[in-house]
Amino acid sequence: MKKIAYLECPTGIAGDMCLGALIDGGVPLEYLKNQLNRLGIAAEYDLRAETVIRQGQRATKVFVDLKTKATHHDHDHSQDQTHHHHADHAPHRHLPEIQAMIKGAGLPERVERWSLAIFQNLAIAEATVHGTTPEQVHFHEVGATDALVDIVGTCLGLDWLEIDELYCAPMPTGGGTVKAAHGILPVPVPAVLQLWQQRQVPVYSNGIEKELVTPTGAAIATTLATDFCQPPAMTLAKIALGSGTIDLPLPNLLRLWIGHQPETPHLETIVTLETQIDDLNPQAIAYACEKLQAAGALDVFTQGITMKKNRLGTLLTVICPVALVEICEEILFTETSTLGIRRHTQTRSILQRRFETVATPAGEIQLKIGYRGDKIYNVQPEYEDVKAIAQQTGQSWQAIAQQALCQFPRDAES
């Protein structure tokens, strides 16, 4: 069975509401604090949770108490509340520093990957709004401690719950105005609009003239959600409620549906990016490919082609998840000479994957196993494991790989 989750956000979404729903769903508060402290921010905040009642419904409200002079942006939908982008948030951090903190924290692999993608997408949105690059944006909000807690904490919670796939409901627009570091802004604020545009998020008005979706909440949903839709088919196991701060005409709650789906042929929406280049040093193309792979592209490859005027060129193709399209396009525009990129949205069928370690006479090797339901279709030894042992022993790569495959239990393939 596959474990899925659905974010239902009738009154919007913010980072603290995500944390509240996850803790309400069973994620231990102390686990979150211990993992978050690996970012080196233990002296900057305290995290606590309380049970609250919102229009007769019990829910969990999370508070991020900053120990420096700053005001956390609770999701209170109030036009009098200062927006995420505070002028007095401390400390302010730029994107490269945030990335270094996350990469150096030793977080679970999915948590690191998700967190980096969320911050990158938010940086791209802010940079587009302010007419600069993601690395040059001075983040009042993204670099603040509370945003680190909200974003990385949400990723930790989803990983702890072992959520395989996340879906999200269409989002309410809200309305009115909000105070920000750049002055008074209309709601939805520009960064939220940009994030919605990047993912083509379906939105609607529920008639509430407050700020309902914050940049952090929008970045989390637009990066991690597979689709924005009505609730997917599932066997519902739990409903968890994360609370906002003030009362609204609707209960101020983010509802997290947690359930299971039977294992079926897995279909995944991907985007193929293509660009043709005939005026760039091959070394620069190689570097761009490395950056794309590091950013999370599913595959990157090049093909030699003949272009107009019979010039030899390169067709650079990138296959990536929908959530990473903007990131990969940013790399292509920054690192290559291309003036345009083609997008093709496709659906692919993929096998599920798991890893097992087997002991061979030469040492332990990890096997990647491709399966669907109870049937195993493919077993391959991990290249780097085989390479390391081959170099140590002087045996051929193929001989070591065959030893590993021989140790895989044959009855597991039936």
From Swiss-Prot:
Record keywords: Nickel
Keyword Disulfide bond: no
Classification via Gene3D superfamilies: mk0293 like domain (3.10.20.300), Transcriptional regulatory protein pf0864 domain like (3.30.70.1380)
Ribosomal protein listed as a keyword: no
Stretch list, region Disordered: 70-91
GO molecular-function term, one example from the UniProt record: lyase activity
A Pfam family hit: Ni_insertion
Family: Belongs to the LarC family.
PANTHER family noted in UniProt: NICKEL INSERTION PROTEIN-RELATED, PYRIDINIUM-3,5-BISTHIOCARBOXYLIC ACID MONONUCLEOTIDE NICKEL INSERTION PROTEIN
Protein name: Putative nickel insertion protein
Organism: Picosynechococcus sp. (strain ATCC 27264 / PCC 7002 / PR-6) (Agmenellum quadruplicatum)
